[in-house]
Swiss-Prot record:
Function, as annotated: Intrinsic thylakoid membrane protein that fixes RPOT2 on the stromal side of the thylakoid membrane.
Record keywords, A-Z: Chloroplast, Membrane, Metal-binding, Plastid, Thylakoid, Transmembrane, Transmembrane helix, Zinc, Zinc-finger
Name the record gives this protein: NEP1-interacting protein 2
Localization: Plastid, Chloroplast thylakoid membrane
Membrane topology type: Multi-pass membrane protein
Organism superkingdom: Eukaryota
InterPro entries given in the database record: Gly-zipper_YMGG (IPR027367), Znf_RING (IPR001841), Znf_RING/FYVE/PHD (IPR013083)
Keyword Transmembrane helix in annotation: yes
Record-linked Pfam families: Gly-zipper_YMGG, zf-RING_2
GO annotations of cellular component type: chloroplast thylakoid membrane
Stromal side: 58-76, 131-241
Native organism: Arabidopsis thaliana
């Protein structure tokens, strides 16, 4: 009788691990799945942050360089141009990255998204995307600055006028030589197409421009005429007219 009870006890006690094994296994699998999901989410966040930083850094550097070069040739100035370019380049690069990420997560084909992302990266590194964004931003800054100078010039000396000369009269402005853009005078020494440093637009064949005396810098008539009515110097080299 005792032997029977002992056997029954051993059987019952041995049955508990058998009944609890499936529950324990499911619990372990859930823990593994949760850990796998957590690790994937963390890695995805880290990779996204690294790529965002990369795009922002490249955009900032290229934007600052492009903005500085444009600002040096306009009224924005080297430092202000670099600052505007850096901010615009960083913001635009992050926008491009986020758009690429949204496209990657969409229902579009993975291969097409991959080619698009490669094209974006190449265009970003070459500076094309940043230049396309910086140009309008710098033009807006130049126009805003010229408008501000126009309203304050009667009471204050322009911060950008190092020559100290006042604006010319309308009659004097009209006496400054005009010329028509042709294939012979539309390029600089580096064979690049000349452009107006006020509005940043390239000169087109057949356009009438004004060539300043002494320095011979050329500008669109509306751009330079408005400038000369407020300043008596070249907006590029500051040489007095």
């Amino acid at each position: 009788m005792a032997s029977s009870s002992s056997s029954s006890y051993r059987f019952q006690s041995g049955s508990y691990p058998l009944s609890s094994s499936p529950s324990l296994g499911n619990f372990v699998e859930r823990i593994k799945d949760a850990c796998h999901f957590l690790v994937s989410a963390v890695l995805g966040t880290i990779i996204s942050a690294i790529l965002t930083f990369f795009f922002a850094l490249v955009g900032t550097l290229l934007g600052a360089l492009t903005g500085a070069l444009i600002g040096q040739e306009t009224e924005s100035g080297f430092i202000r141009g670099a600052a505007i370019g850096a901010i615009s380049g960083a913001v635009f690069s992050i926008e491009v990255f986020e758009s690429s990420l949204d496209l990657w997560k969409s229902d579009e084909s993975g291969f097409g998204c991959f080619l698009y992302l490669i094209d974006v990266i190449v265009s970003l590194l070459s500076g094309r995307l940043v230049r396309e964004r910086i140009g309008p931003a710098m033009l807006s800054a130049v126009q805003s600055q010229m408008g501000a100078v126009d309203t304050a010039f009667d009471d204050h000396t322009s911060l950008f006028d190092t020559g100290g000369s006042k604006g010319l009269t309308g009659d004097l402005v009209e006496k400054i030589p005009k010329m028509t853009i042709t294939g012979n005078n539309n390029t600089d020494a580096s064979e690049n197409t000349d452009s107006c440093s006020v509005c940043l637009q390239d000169f087109q064949l057949g356009e009438t421009v004004r060539s300043l005396p002494h320095c011979h810098h050329m500008f669109h008539l509306p751009c330079i005429d408005n400038w000369l009515l407020r300043h008596g110097s070249c907006p590029m080299c500051r040489r007095d007219i």
